[in-house]
Amino acid sequence: MKKNTLLNSELSYIIATLGHTDEITICDAGLPIPDASQRIDLALIQGIPTFIDTVKATLAEMQIEGVIVAEEFKTVSPQMHDELMTLIAAEEAQCGKSITVSYIPHEEFKIHTRESKAIVRTGECTPYANVIFQSGVVF
């Protein structure tokens, strides 16, 4: 369910059409995107837009109840992992609901992206900077 305004029409539309437990993936520039998945390609050049900026814009619009990340994200890119977890904690505080965080192996993560209604590609070049958001409800 949408919460605010977003300029990218494709991403805004996907968020507006999400039902409870539907998923979207926000990924770095290198994550393979399955042919059958809807691709929203925001990448312009390396680093633009960033993973974190895209997560912030998405969280401003989307109510989430679950997060899935690769186990490798914590150890290979700990600073960015911590930034993401800080945003998730802030989202929990703002909405007053707990958000489940699950870790799975990266290979399993890539397979799980097939369940997403859309995969949003950023210009991020930090290893494992990928997240799956599970849609919640605003009530």
From Swiss-Prot:
Disulfide bonds: none annotated. It is found in: Cytoplasm. One of its GO terms (biological process) is D-ribose catabolic process. It comes from the Bacteria. Its EC number is 5.4.99.62. Gene3D superfamilies: RbsD-like domain. Pathway: Carbohydrate metabolism; D-ribose degradation; D-ribose 5-phosphate from beta-D-ribopyranose: step 1/2. Signal peptide: none annotated. The active site is at H20. Its main location: cytoplasm. Homodecamer. PANTHER family: D-RIBOSE PYRANASE. Catalyzes the interconversion of beta-pyran and beta-furan forms of D-ribose. This is D-ribose pyranase.
